[in-house]
Each structure stands twice: as C-alpha cells, then as structure tokens.
Regions:
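P-loop NTPase motor domains
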Residues: 1-177
Length: 177
C-alpha cells in the first residue's frame, strides 16, 4: 500500500517520478513525453490552444535536454530549474549548453535541438509568453516537497496489473488546481 501525498507538510509520501517511465528507445521517447505534457498542459475545449501547444513543445525540448545529460537529475523539478535559465536569460542558457555539449563531443539529439529551436527562435514577446505558460503549469515543482516526491520511485506503475498493489493519492482539493 502506497500513499502519494506530494504536498504533505511532514514529507510523508511515497515517491513517483513520471520521467522514469520515458522509454530509452528514441523511437518512443517523444510519444512518452507527450503523454506527460498532455496531463500537465491540458487545454479546455474552445480555448486558445496555441500557448498550451507551444508550452508542450518547450516541455518536450527541456525534457530531452535534461534526459540527455546524465549528470542532471531526471526530474520535473530539474526541468523547471533549467527553465529558469540557471542565472542567465533562458535562450542564452540553452544555446550555451547546446554549444558546450557539442564541443565536448556529447551533442544533444536532433529531436532535442529541433524542439528547443522551435521555441528559442520565436520573437521575444512570443517566447516570453510561452515561457510564462510553461512556468504557470510547472511552478508546483518549485515546492521542495513536490520536487522531493517526484524525484524517484518507490513503486513501479507497470506492476499495477501484475502484483497486488494499492496506491492512494493524498492531495487536498485546494492543491488540485
């Protein structure tokens, strides 16, 4: 029996990291990432989907950006931290990291570069709005408790139908928004 309660002020929660379920096979990575981004950046019928779709592209790029750097934690919290620009403007941070990895002989995948380029080549006003949309949905990972609760796995969701496994979600209504 597991209780996933990422906002528990005592830290009494099991951990669940959605990024750990992304396939290592490049052929399936984007669809796995898209499944996660669809849950985070859901759009209401009839709403302007443009900003949400662009934020999903940013999510795709940053997810690959994090996953392709073994020295970084492969977590949603790390994606949010990378989106801050790490003390630099975000465009500069991403471009400088891409260039540095290229020089080290450890270039990012073309899928990662393509996703990032679609976002960082936008005009500044558009880019700023996309980053704001991304941050508005990802800011929950700035919370130390949520970041910790999504940093690793204490159970494997793939075992749900194979083993006797019960997972409770302990999230109060005011945190569901």
């Amino acid at each position: 029996v597991y209780l996933f309660a990422p906002y528990d002020t005592q830290g009494r929660t099991c951990r669940y990291n959605p990024l750990s379920y992304i396939s290592k096979d490049k052929a399936f990575q984007i669809s796995d990432i898209d499944s996660i981004s669809a849950a985070i950046f859901s759009t209401k019928v009839g709403s302007d989907e443009f900003w949400s779709d662009q934020a999903k592209d940013m999510f795709r790029g940053l997810c690959l950006f994090v996953l392709e750097q073994p020295e970084l934690p492969h977590t949603l919290g790390e994606m949010f931290r990378q989106a801050s620009g790490k003390g630099k403007p975000l465009k500069d941070h991403l471009q400088q990291t891409v260039e540095a990895k290229q020089k080290e002989g450890k270039p990012f995948s073309s899928a990662c570069i393509d996703c990032l380029n679609r976002v960082i080549t936008m005009p500044d006003n558009t880019f700023g709005s996309v980053v704001a949309t991304f941050n508005s949905k990802m800011k929950m990972f700035q919370n130390v408790l949520v970041d910790m609760a999504t940093s690793d796995n204490d159970f494997d969701l793939r075992d749900v139908r194979k083993k006797k496994l019960t997972i409770y979600f302990g999230i109060t209504p005011n945190k569901l928004a």
